[in-house]
Amino acid sequence: MAGISSGLEGIRAISWNTVPILKVSLGNDQVWPAFDPVLTPVTAVGAYTYNIPAQAEFIDVILLGAGGGGQGMGSATAWGQGGFGGSWVTATLRRGVDIPWAVTQITGVIGAGGTAGPGYIFGQTGAGGKGGDTTATFSGGGTLIAAGGAGGNSRKLDFGGKSPNPADMVYRDRTYDGGARQLTPSGIGYAPGGGGAAATVPVGITGLAGGPGARGQAWFLAY
């Protein structure tokens, strides 16, 4: 493919002293990188298909699992526990090495947020549901899995929905944003990957439900 190489290895970064060089041209023709990087976020819950740009040699894969649901509160119990943020997974795939050139698609699933913990009478738990896993797989290779966050299930007065850990992922000098901490009781987790908040106020004899977790997300950077 077109571009600059050192032997058989493509050059992935060029700098002048400490200043990164973004592009190299020969006359009017851009020769490095072979084409401008293309970032593709995937946000819709459920199955997806990512089409690899034909000229790309590398694909950065960033996955974030969905957030867990916040715990519900019983009519005579302490505050519930907020849901936990989803986990991150990162990888760089090199075509012809980690993934065959003949493979043109990556498929997977974007995890759904964990269900809200229901309100219960007296001492029942009302646990929040686990967030769904976010995955990526391709023909001839394995499957990358970013686990969803656990649902809240403890009376520790820790009602806030948790962010992913770390809250944002920095990978190869790019920042990918995760969801913020949810501090409104029974609030829905912030996308992507944030946990739902637990309930803090009882309502009637059945208590009050927590908040559902936020969806996961995938990002693909082709270059």
UniProtKB/Swiss-Prot annotation:
Top-rank lineage group of the source organism: Viruses
Protein name according to UniProt: Gene 32 protein
